[in-house]
Swiss-Prot record:
Its main location: nucleus. It is an enzyme of class 2 (transferase). Residues 1-112, 549-615, 637-660, 674-706, 797-965 are annotated as: Disordered. This is Histone-lysine N-methyltransferase, H3 lysine-36 specific. It is found in: Nucleus; Chromosome. GO terms for molecular function: histone H3K36 trimethyltransferase activity. It catalyses: L-lysyl(36)-[histone H3] + 3 S-adenosyl-L-methionine = N(6),N(6),N(6)-trimethyl-L-lysyl(36)-[histone H3] + 3 S-adenosyl-L-homocysteine + 3 H(+). It comes from Aspergillus oryzae (strain ATCC 42149 / RIB 40) (Yellow koji mold). Histone methyltransferase that trimethylates histone H3 'Lys-36' forming H3K36me3. Involved in transcription elongation as well as in transcription repression. The gene is set2. Residues 150-223 form the AWS domain. The AWS and SET domains are necessary for transcription repression. Keywords: Chromosome, Methyltransferase, Nucleus, Repressor, S-adenosyl-L-methionine, Transcription, Transcription regulation, Transferase.
Length: 965
C-alpha cells in the first residue's frame, strides 16, 4: 500500500474535526502563502487531502485503531490523561478530559534541513520548450506610461578599475579603459559596496559617476545565469541551474507583455476558455501585470515551491520598473530553480502543488488555501519591522500574535508592534517605500521613520535618496492630508546643511502648491518648510562630466598609452594618502660613508657641479662669430668686439601724424569697399552645364553638411593644405622658417575665404585636379613675390648700413588698395577653356574693382589687430641685410618698400622677432688688446666657445630672450 492511500484513509476521519479546531496561541505557527492554503489540507503528493465523502463524519479520535495512527498514553510518562494523535509532520490532535480536541504543534514549524534534490539526470529540453512560446529579449508595454517610475538618482560611488590580468587596482584616464575593456574591469557598485542605488534597488545608468560597466547594471547587460529547461514528472517544464549560484545572484529577468488590470482580467477568462491551465501572470505594480503566457523568456519556466531557493524582486532601471529572479541561498548545479508564488502569481483555478516539501501548503492558488498567512513579501515584512515567529522566539519572551482566519493584512500589521528603526534597517525601509503602491503600507513605513529620533538614522535616510523618495510619495498621496502632514514632519526633522539635495530632488516644486491647498495645517507646515529651505546655502560641487553614449573613443596607440600610464602613476604617487618613507635617524658612523667631508655632515655627496653663469646681452644687442672670435652687433648696424654692457640705442618712434593718416586711409578704403559690395551674388555658372544624375551616397559620407560654416572652412583648409605644402617645400631655402609657416597659413586662409565667398566649394572634403593646379599656381606666385619682397627688404637695409646712414625707419605711408592687398590669384592668367568649364573662373572674370573690394574686406578682419599694434612702442628696428645677389632684379624695390611695412607690422602684432643676420665684423684694429684683467675675467668664466655655442642654441629656441625690445 502506498503512503498516499494511507494518507487518504486517515484524512477522512479527522477532516471535520480539524476544520473546526483552532490552533493554540502559544504553539501555533504558520507558513506564509498566497490566497489561502491550509496546513491541514494537502494534496496526494504530500499527505492529507480533503475527500468529498467526508460530510457526516463525527470526531472519532478514540475509536481510531492503533494501526492507523499511534496514540500516546500519557499515563506512562505523566499523571495527566491527555491524549495526542499525530496528524502529519509536527501537527498533532491533542485531547484533554472534558475538553474538545485541539490542533497543536510540538514546536515551531521549521523546514527540516535536508540535502537539495538534484535533477542533473534529466535531459536539456530548452529547444523543445521554446516552441511553446514566443521568445522576447525585453518587456513590451501596452503604452509608454506602463511600468513608468521616476528616476533621477545618481550614486556617489567612484570608479574602481582593476586589471583583469594581474588583479591590481589601477588609476588611469577612463578613455584608456574604454579602449581596452578586456584588460580592465570596473568594480564600482559591487555587491559588497555601499552603493546607494544598489541598496535601494536602482540600477546605475550612463549619467552616474561610477563610470561605464559598473557592477550595478545586471538588467541592462542581461547578466543571466547559466540555466536549462527540463521536463519534470508532474510540473511540466522547469528551470535548472547549470552552475553553482551564490546568494542574491541575478538569475533571469521575468519578461513578458506589461498590461493593465482590465486586460489582465480579460486574458484570464480568455486563457481559461482556451484550456490553458498554466498561467504566467506576475504583478508588476498596482494595476499593472506582466503576462508571459504566450510571449516571454526562459524565466517563465521557474516553478513554485513552498520552500523556494529563489525570490522575485523589482528593480528600477532607467525610467522603468523591471522584475527579476534572484538566488535566495547557495544553489548547487543541478538544482531546480523555484520561488514562492504566494505574493503576486495569479491563475484561474486553484492548482495543486507538487513541490514535495515538508511545509507544502497543498495548492498554489485558490480559496482552499489558508488565510492565516500574510500575502506580504519577505522584504516588505522586514521593512515594516515584523519578524517571523522563529526570529521572535529568541528576541522576546512572548511570541507575537499570529494572523487570525479571515483577518486582513492591514488589521494584522496594526495589531503587531513593529521594531524601532535602526541604522542598518534604513536601506530596506527606503527600498520598500520607493516601490510601495498601497497607502496603508506607505503610512506604516513613514511612521517608522517619523518615530525615529536617532540622528544617524535620519542622516542615513537622507543619504538613501530620502528627498527623492519622499517627493514621489508626496506626489502619490497628495490628496490625503494626513499622509502629507506625516511626510512634511519627516522633512522638517531632516538635517539641514546645504540645499543641494533639495534642489536635485525638485521637492520644492511639489510642496509649493500645498501652501494653498485649503488645509490650514498643511499650508502652515509647507510654508514654514519652504521658508527654512530658502535660507540654506548651495554648496559648490565640481560639475560631473556628462559622457556621450554615442561618442566613439579615439584610437590610442600602445606607446601613447604607456606614457599616459607612467604620468598617471607619478601623479597618483604624489597624491597618495599613504605616509611617505621617513628619513632614517642617524645610526652612528659607518666606515664606508666616511670621506673627505667627514661623517658629521650628511649633506655632502661629492663636489658641487659647476654651474655656468648666464649673463644675457643687453637689450638690442646680438652675438655672432667671425674666424672663431665673437663680435656683437645691434639692430641698427653697430658692431663691436667688446661685450656691451648697456642697451643698444633705439631709433626714434615714427611720427604719430603719419601713422594716423595711414590708418585713416585704410579705414576709408574698407568703408568704400563695403558700400560697393553687392548684397546678393548669383551662383549660376557662366555656361550652363548638363545635369548629371546624383548618385545615392551612403549615410555618413556627407557629414560635413551638418557642420557650421567655420567647421566646413576648417575641413576645406585641411583639404587644401597638402597642395600648399607641396609648394612651400620648394621655398625652404629662400625664406626664413617662421615667415614660411606664417605665409602658408595666410595663403590657406585667403584661398578658403575666397572660395567660400564666391560659392566655389561644392564638397570641402575634396577638390578637382583643375583646382589643385590653380592652388599650386597661386601659391607659387604668392611665394615668388614673397621672396622678392624679402630680398628687397634685405638689400635696402644693407645699403643703409654700407653708406653709414643714420638708422631711422621711414615713416610708413598709407598704402593704396592695390598695394595693401597681398598677392591675388589672377583670373586673366587662366586658360579660356578653364573659364568655361569651371564655375570658379566664371566668378573671377570680373574686373580689378572686385579684387580691390575683396582686398578691402580682407583687411577688415585684421583692422582691430592693426590698430592695437600701432599703440605698441617699437624699441627695435629691422636689422641690416646681406648684399643682394647679382641675379636679382631691383626694379620692384619701390613696391617692396610698401609691402615691407605691412610685413613689419604683422611681425610686431604676432610678437615675433627673429634675430637679424649679422653684418660684417668690425675691423681688427678695433679689437681690444688682452689685458691681465681680461685674462682674469676669462679664467673665471666658462670657455668662450662653449658660451657662444650656448648662446646660439638659446637664440634658436627662444630668440626673444636676448633680442627682447
Amino acid at each position: 500500500m502506498s503512503p498516499h492511500d494511507y494518507a487518504d484513509r486517515r484524512s477522512e476521519s479527522v477532516t471535520d474535526a480539524v476544520t473546526a479546531m483552532n490552533l493554540e496561541p502559544d504553539r501555533a505557527t504558520d507558513t506564509p502563502a498566497l490566497n489561502g492554503g491550509s496546513t491541514s489540507l494537502k494534496d496526494d503528493t504530500n499527505g492529507v487531502s480533503r475527500s468529498p465523502s467526508a460530510q457526516n463524519m463525527d470526531v472519532a479520535v478514540k475509536s481510531r485503531s492503533s494501526s492507523q495512527t499511534p496514540v500516546k498514553k500519557e499515563e506512562e510518562t505523566s499523571n495527566t490523561a491527555d491524549m495526542e494523535e499525530k496528524v502529519g509532520g509536527d501537527i498533532t490532535v491533542k485531547q484533554e478530559p472534558g475538553q474538545p480536541p485541539k490542533l497543536t504543534r510540538s514546536s515551531s514549524q521549521k523546514v527540516v534541513a535536508r540535502p537539495p534534490q538534484l535533477f542533473s539526470h534529466l535531459r536539456d529540453s530548452t529547444a523543445e520548450a521554446r516552441v511553446s512560446f514566443e521568445l522576447m529579449d525585453s518587456c513590451t508595454y501596452a503604452n509608454k506610461y506602463m511600468g513608468y517610475t521616476e528616476h533621477a538618482m545618481e550614486c556617489d560611488c567612484a570608479e574602481e578599475w582593476v586589471s583583469s590580468v594581474s588583479g591590481n587596482i589601477l588609476s588611469m584616464p577612463i578613455s584608456l579603459y574604454a579602449l581596452e575593456p578586456a584588460l580592465s574591469k570596473n568594480l564600482a557598485c559591487g555587491e559588497d559596496s555601499d552603493c546607494i542605488n544598489r541598496a535601494t534597488k536602482i540600477e546605475c545608468v550612463g549619467d552616474c559617476g561610477c563610470g561605464p560597466d559598473c557592477q550595478n547594471q545586471r538588467f541592462q547587460r542581461k547578466e543571466y545565469a547559466q540555466v536549462a529547461v527540463i521536463k519534470t514528472e508532474k510540473k511540466g517544464f522547469g528551470l535548472r541551474a547549470e552552475a553553482d549560484l551564490r546568494p542574491h545572484q541575478f538569475i533571469y529577468e521575468y519578461v513578458g507583455e506589461v498590461i493593465n488590470e482590465g486586460q489582465f482580467r480579460r486574458r484570464m477568462r480568455q486563457y481559461d476558455e482556451e484550456g490553458i491551465k498554466h498561467f504566467y501572470f506576475m504583478s508588476l505594480s498596482k494595476g499593472e501585470f506582466v503576462d508571459a503566457t504566450k510571449r516571454g523568456n526562459l524565466g517563465r519556466f521557474c516553478n513554485h515551491s513552498c520552500n523556494p531557493n529563489c525570490y522575485v524582486d523589482k528593480w528600477v532601471v532607467g525610467e522603468k520598473l523591471r522584475m527579476g529572479i534572484f538566488a535566495e541561498r547557495d544553489i548547487q548545479a543541478g538544482e531546480e530553480l523555484v520561488f514562492n508564488y504566494n505574493v503576486d502569481r495569479y491563475g484561474a483555478d486553484p492548482q495543486p502543488c507538487y513541490c514535495g516539501e515538508p511545509n507544502c501548503t497543498g495548492f498554489i492558488g485558490g480559496r482552499t488555501q489558508t488565510e492565516r498567512a500574510t500575502k506580504l513579501s519577505n522584504a516588505t515584512i522586514e521593512a515594516l519591522g515584523i519578524e517571523d515567529a522563529d526570529g521572535w522566539d529568541t528576541a522576546v519572551a512572548k511570541r507575537p500574535r499570529k494572523k487570525k482566519m479571515g483577518e486582513d493584512d492591514e488589521e494584522y500589521v496594526d495589531s503587531v508592534q513593529p521594531k524601532s528603526l535602526e541604522e542598518n534597517g534604513v536601506t530596506k525601509v527606503m527600498a520598500a517605500l520607493m516601490q510601495c503602491q498601497e497607502k496603508w503600507i506607505a503610512v506604516k513605513l513613514l511612521g517608522r521613520i517619523q518615530r525615529c529620533d536617532d540622528e544617524r538614522v535620519r542622516n542615513r535616510v537622507v543619504k538613501m535618496h530620502g528627498y527623492q523618495i519622499l517627493n514621489s510619495q508626496l506626489t502619490m498621496w497628495k490628496d490625503d492630508f494626513n499622509v502629507v502632514l506625516q511626510i512634511l514632519d519627516i522633512l522638517d526633522k531632516f538635517p539641514r546643511l546645504t540645499r543641494n539635495k533639495i534642489i536635485d530632488s525638485k521637492i520644492e516644486v511639489t510642496i509649493q502648491p500645498l501652501t494653498s491647498c485649503g488645509d490650514e495645517r498643511v499650508e502652515k507646515r509647507a510654508a514654514t518648510l519652504l521658508q527654512v529651505w530658502s535660507t540654506l546655502e548651495v554648496g559648490y560641487r565640481i560639475p560631473r562630466m556628462k559622457r556621450d553614449p554615442n561618442a566613439t573613443a579615439q584610437a590610442v596607440n600602445q606607446f601613447e598609452r604607456r606614457e599616459t600610464i607612467r604620468d598617471q602613476r607619478r601623479r597618483s604617487k604624489s597624491r597618495s594618502r599613504s605616509r611617505s618613507r621617513s628619513i632614517e635617524a642617524p645610526r652612528g658612523p659607518a666606515a664606508q660613508t666616511r670621506g673627505v667631508y667627514g661623517q658629521r655632515n650628511p649633506h655632502h655627496h661629492g663636489p658641487r657641479s659647476f654651474r655656468r653663469q648666464f649673463n644675457p646681452l643687453p637689450t638690442g644687442w646680438f652675438a655672432a662669430e667671425s674666424n672663431g672670435r665673437t663680435y656683437y652687433y645691434s639692430a641698427r648696424g653697430d658692431t663691436t668686439w667688446t661685450r656691451p654692457t648697456k642697451p643698444a640705442p633705439q631709433p626714434p618712434p615714427p611720427p604719430k601724424e603719419s601713422r594716423d593718416k595711414a590708418l585713416q586711409d585704410i579705414i576709408d578704403g574698407i568703408m568704400n569697399a563695403k558700400e560697393n559690395t553687392p548684397k546678393e551674388k548669383s551662383g549660376t555658372p557662366g555656361t550652363p552645364q548638363v545635369s548629371k544624375p546624383i548618385p545615392v551616397k551612403k549615410e555618413g559620407q556627407e557629414k560635413w553638411r551638418g557642420y557650421s560654416e567655420d567647421k566646413q572652412k576648417k575641413v576645406y583648409e585641411n583639404t587644401l593644405f597638402p597642395h600648399i605644402k607641396y609648394v612651400v617645400d620648394k621655398f625652404k631655402h629662400k625664406l626664413p622658417k617662421e615667415d614660411l609657416k606664417r605665409y602658408a597659413k595666410d595663403v590657406a586662409k585667403k584661398l578658403v575665404n575666397s572660395d567660400f565667398k564666391n560659392n566655389r566649394v561644392e564638397d570641402p572634403t575634396k577638390i578637382s585636379e583643375k583646382q589643385q593646379k590653380k592652388v599650386k599656381k597661386y601659391c607659387k606666385e604668392f611665394f615668388d613675390k614673397a621672396v622678392l619682397k624679402h630680398r628687397a627688404y634685405e638689400q635696402r637695409k644693407y645699403e643703409k648700413q654700407a653708406k653709414g646712414m643714420d638708422s631711422k625707419v621711414e615713416t610708413p605711408q598709407a598704402p593704396s588698395d592695390d598695394e595693401a592687398l597681398d598677392v591675388k590669384m589672377s583670373d586673366d592668367e587662366e586658360d579660356k577653356a578653364d573659364e568655361k568649364d569651371t564655375p570658379m573662373t566664371a566668378e573671377e572674370t570680373q574686373g580689378g574693382t572686385k579684387r580691390k573690394r575683396e582686398g578691402g574686406i580682407a583687411e577688415d578682419s585684421n583692422l582691430g589687430e592693426y590698430i592695437s599694434s600701432s599703440k605698441r612702442q617699437r624699441s627695435s628696428t629691422p636689422p641690416p641685410l646681406p648684399p643682394i645677389s647679382p641675379g636679382d632684379d631691383p626694379q620692384n624695390m619701390d613696391n617692396a618698400k610698401k609691402i615691407l611695412r605691412d610685413d613689419i607690422d604683422s611681425r610686431s602684432e604676432n610678437n615675433e622677432f627673429t634675430p637679424p643676420p649679422p653684418p660684417p665684423p668690425p675691423p681688427d684694429d678695433e679689437m681690444p688688446s688682452e689685458s691681465p684683467e681680461t685674462d682674469h675675467a676669462i679664467d673665471q668664466s666658462p670657455s668662450r666657445a662653449e658660451y657662444i655655442t650656448d648662446m646660439n642654441k638659446l637664440k634658436s629656441s627662444q630668440p626673444e630672450i636676448e633680442g627682447k625690445v
